[in-house]
Amino acid sequence: MLKNPFITYGYEGPEYFCDRVQETKSLTGLLQNGNNVVLMSPRRMGKTGLLMHSFGQAEVAEEYNTFLIDIYATSNLQDLVFSMGKAILSQLMPRGQKALSRFVKTVSSLRPVMSVDIMGNPNWSIEPSRSEDPSYSLDQIFKYLSESDRPNIVAIDEFQQIVFYPEKNVEAVLRTLIQRCKNTVWVFSGSSRHLLSEMFISPARPFYA
C-alpha cells in the first residue's frame, strides 16, 4: 500500500501550509496592534494551524513570546492552571535555565517535573508544589506574563470549555486577570459559535466588549 503523501491533520511547518495568506496577514496585524482576537470556526477547519503559522511569522516570532494553550480536555479550574503552566514551560525549555528559573520563582505554587519515556526522550509536566487554591496559581501565572522580558501573545484554544467548569465566576475571574495583565495580547479560539457568541456578545457576560 502506498503511503499517503498529503498531510491530513496537524501543522507541519510553513512549507506545507497552503493558502490563508490574507487570514495570516490579518491575524498577525491585529495582534501586533495590540488587539485581542476571537477566532471561531468548526473543529478541524484549521484554527490551530492558522495560529501556529501566524506565530511562526518573523515579525511575531522575533518580537513576542507565543503560547498556544489547548483546554479542550480540561474540566475545571485546576486543569486550566496545569494546561497554562505546561504550555508556558514547554516554550521556556529551549531558552535555558535562566528562563526556567524565573518561571519557577514567580509561579512558586507549581513545580516542573521531568520524566523520561521508553525512547529516552524527556517529557515535562506540572504539579502543585503544595496544596493551593488554583486561583492563587492562576494569579501567579498572570503575574509571570505581566513581568515577562518581552510582549506575549497567548492563544487559548477551545476557550468555550470554561463555561462547563464547576467553579463559580470563572469568566469573571479570567476577565479581571486578563484586563490587569500587562504586556499580553490574547486570542480566544473555539469551535462552538453559539457559546462563544454568548460569551462575547451578551451584555450580561463578563467578556462582553
Predicted regions and their residues:
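Short, well-ordered alpha-helices that flank and scaffold nucleotide-derived cofactor binding pockets
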Residues: 29, 53-60, 86, 176-179, ...
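Hydrophobic/aromatic beta-strand patches that form the interior of the parallel beta-sheet core
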Residues: 37, 67-69, 187
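Short glycine-/polar-rich loops that comprise or flank the Walker A/P-loop
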Residues: 62-66, 182-184, 208-209
